[in-house]
Each structure stands twice: as structure tokens, then as C-alpha cells.
UniProtKB/Swiss-Prot annotation:
Protein name in the entry: Chaperone protein DnaJ
PROSITE patterns: DNAJ_1, DNAJ_2, ZF_CR
Domain J, residue spans: 5-70
Subcellular location: Cytoplasm
CXXCXGXG motif repeat feature ranges: 156-163, 173-180, 195-202, 209-216
Function: Participates actively in the response to hyperosmotic and heat shock by preventing the aggregation of stress-denatured proteins and by disaggregating proteins, also in an autonomous, DnaK-independent fashion. Unfolded proteins bind initially to DnaJ; upon interaction with the DnaJ-bound protein, DnaK hydrolyzes its bound ATP, resulting in the formation of a stable complex. GrpE releases ADP from DnaK; ATP binding to DnaK triggers the release of the substrate protein, thus completing the reaction cycle.
Lineage, opening ranks: Bacteria, Pseudomonadati, Pseudomonadota, Alphaproteobacteria, Rhodobacterales
Encoding gene (name): dnaJ
Length: 384
């Protein structure tokens, strides 16, 4: 039978770089993998060819021998004891793709770090949990103690989290001898799979706990008290170590992460550690000056002087009346912005007074006078 060209199998040129060869292999292996082409013998045969080709071309010495002697370099007939390759004695196709196989198919093979990655992974850490918490601006200012109910799992009390009846220790899996993997030989090709007996755990529970059915944990709601520090803002994350999902079979629990959202306030707007408050003032107070009382986030009141001739948008600052910094560093300010109100629902007498005021106010409106002077100049220019 004619032997296939390894470069053609991977779809690369003879001068392809190691990275190009690896990239081509990954693409082919993913496309032809038996778990994705079950029952298709042609795809299985091509998959073997792809791995055989990659086993040679990824290795500098084997590649050099193949480039010089072709397939003869791996047939054991070279008097000089040439390299023995993927089809020769001692060949192990699993090595041909061990460096990328886990990366490609780790999700369903278990991966190096997961249950199917070899080694004894009976005790597994529990998953982390997320809890979204809304707090008021006042709570963010002062800090608060909040009680929450967290759904999730806890260690089984009946088996002490071991998963075995009576708290007995799990036993080494007889199928994989504790490795968590089994190997299947298919001709020249060796495939590693997650052990079907222990699910990659490496150990089995002979008599599963009747309460948790061998998992070592049970579903249970928990009530927790959470300390909300002063200065939190939307997006602040609080970590409660060990308050996440219970671990599997005695493994450590995960963590609980509290994500803070601060509700909008009816009076104050927040920008970091500073607070903004828009305060309405009458036209008379803005013109003559005066004093206005404003609330503060701590529940108190402060009096602010309104300068004579104030316009809408004028800002004044109250030092130290803002929000505290989350991790120290002082307290922000409160910025007061004036909003001059135009009176409505006037009485006849008020209208009369305003009409009189209108007639004599021209010289007292510097911005208005300047604007209309500019308009007049504009019109004069258009006429010219």
C-alpha cells in the first residue's frame, strides 16, 4: 500500500514552520476527532494519519530523517539504527498530540486540571457564587450590616462530606488504578479517555451516602450577615472566603462574591467621593443675595450663602460633606448648584411690579445688554 505524504496529510508545504505545522494539526485533529465523527470509519482513519504525520513533523530529528529518507526512516530497515517512528516498534500515538489534545478537547476529556486530568482529584473545591446587593446612598455613606439568604450547597452532615456511608474513605478506582484515565488501543493509535467508572476522580465510593448520594454535599439555603463598609459604590466587590458552594467529597468550599449596586438618590448625585445637589432659589434671592438651607448626606442641614447676582448653574462647595473613600483617604465634598426659578401663577400686583421692573432693568442686565448689542451689530452687518 502506498504511504501518504505527511506534509499532504496536514495540508502544509515542506518548508512550513513548526508553528504552521502545529496550527494545521490542531485544525485537522479537531475536524476529524472520533468523538465528533462517531461511526465514520473514514474520518477515524484520517484522524490516525493526521496524528501519525504530526508525531513525525513536530519532532526536529524525526522530521529531518523523514525529509531525507521518507517513510523508510521509520521502517527499521536502516542499517544505521535509524529512528523508529509512529509505525515502528514502541510507537505510541498518544504522545503525538498530548501537548495540544487536552487543549482542543479538554472540556469533554476532563483536561489536565480537571477531573479527567490524571492524578487523584477526589476532593474538589466548590464553585464560587455571586450575589447582587442593592444598597441606599445613606448605607453607602455610613456602612451597614445586611442579612442575606444564599441558595447553594453545604457539606453533607451524614457523611461529613466524604460521600461514603458512615463517613468511610473512598477507595482507589479498580478500572483506572487511581489515574482518572483509561487508555484504549486502536491499531497503532492510543486514545486516553476519562475513566467511565470514577468519572475521572481516581477513586470510587463503595457504599454511597444515602443522603447526598455520594456527592458529599446537599442543597441548602444559608443566612449570612454581610458587613458593608462605608464608601462602597456601584461595582464594588466584597469577597466572603469559604462561603460559596461546598466542595466535593470534603474539598474546600468556594467563595461568595457580593457585587454592590448603589440606588439612585432623590436629592444627591454621586461622582466618586463627591456629591452634587441642585438647589432651587427664587429670582429675588438670586438677585439680592440671601441664604438657603440644604440637607447633607449625614442627615444634617447646612446653611449656604447665596451671593448677590447669582445665576443658574453657579456652584458652591461644602468641604468634607461628601462620601468617605472606601479604603481611607478622607471624605469628599458636597457641591451645591443653584437653580434660579422663574415665578409662575403671578397675581395682578406681581405682574404690575415686574412690568415696572422690566422697564428700568436694562442697565442692570450686563449679559443681556451685551447679547442684544451683538444681535444689533449682526443685523447691521447683514444690511450692509
Amino acid at each position: 500500500m502506498a504511504k501518504v505524504d505527511f506534509y499532504e496529510v496536514l495540508g502544509v508545504s515542506k518548508g512550513a514552520s513548526a508553528e504552521e505545522i502545529k496550527k494545521a494539526y490542531r485544525s485537522k485533529a479537531k475536524e476529524l476527532h472520533p468523538d465528533r465523527n462517531q461511526g465514520q470509519s473514514a474520518a477515524e482513519a484520517q484522524f490516525k494519519e493526521v496524528n501519525g504525520a504530526y508525531d513525525v513533523l513536530k519532532d526536529g530529528d524525526k522530521k529531518a530523517a523523514y525529509d531525507r529518507y521518507g517513510h523508510a526512516a521509520f521502517e527499521g530497515g536502516m542499517g544505521g539504527g535509524g529512528p523508529r517512528g509512529p509505525y515502528g516498534q514502541g510507537a505510541d500515538f498518544s504522545s503525538a498530540f498530548s501537548d495540544v489534545f487536552e487543549d482542543l478537547f479538554g472540556d469533554f476529556m476532563g483536561g489536565r486540571g480537571g477531573p479527567g486530568g490524571g492524578g487523584r482529584r477526589v476532593r474538589r473545591r466548590g464553585s464560587d457564587l455571586r450575589y447582587n446587593m442593592r444598597v441606599t446612598l445613606e448605607e453607602a455613606f455610613k456602612g451597614a450590616q445586611k442579612t442575606i439568604t444564599v441558595p447553594g450547597s453545604a457539606a453533607c452532615g451524614s457523611c461529613n462530606g466524604t460521600g461514603a456511608e458512615g463517613g468511610a474513605e473512598p477507595q482507589t478506582c479498580p478500572t483506572c488504578s487511581g489515574l482518572g484515565k483509561v487508555r484504549a488501543q486502536n491499531g497503532f493509535f492510543t486514545v486516553e479517555r476519562t475513566c467511565p467508572t470514577c468519572g475521572g476522580q481516581g477513586q470510587v465510593v463503595k457504599n454511597p451516602c444515602r443522603v447526598c448520594h455520594g456527592s458529599g454535599r446537599i442543597e441548602k439555603e444559608r443566612t449570612l450577615s454581610v458587613n458593608i463598609p462605608a464608601g462602597v459604590e456601584t461595582g464594588t466587590r466584597i469577597r466572603l472566603a469559604g462561603e460559596g458552594e461546598a466542595g466535593m467529597r470534603g474539598g474546600p468550599s468556594g467563595d461568595l462574591y457580593i457585587f454592590i449596586e448603589v440606588r439612585e438618590h432623590a436629592i444627591f448625585q454621586r461622582d466618586g467621593v463627591n456629591l452634587f445637589c441642585r438647589v432651587p432659589v427664587s429670582m429675588v434671592s438670586a438677585a439680592l443675595g440671601g441664604e438657603v438651607e440644604v440637607p447633607t448626606i449625614d442627615g444634617g442641614r447646612s446653611k449656604v450663602k447665596v451671593p448677590v447676582g447669582s445665576q443658574s448653574g453657579r456652584q458652591m462647595r461644602l468641604r468634607g460633606k461628601g462620601m468617605p473613600a472606601l479604603r481611607g483617604g478622607g471624605i469628599g465634598d458636597m457641591v451645591i448648584e443653584l437653580a434660579v426659578e422663574t415665578p409662575v401663577n403671578l397675581t395682578a400686583r406681581q405682574k404690575e411690579l415686574l412690568d415696572e421692573f422690566q422697564r428700568i432693568q436694562a442697565e442692570n442686565n450686563p449679559e443681556g445688554a451685551s447679547f442684544f448689542q451683538k444681535v444689533k451689530s449682526f443685523w447691521d452687518g447683514m444690511k450692509g
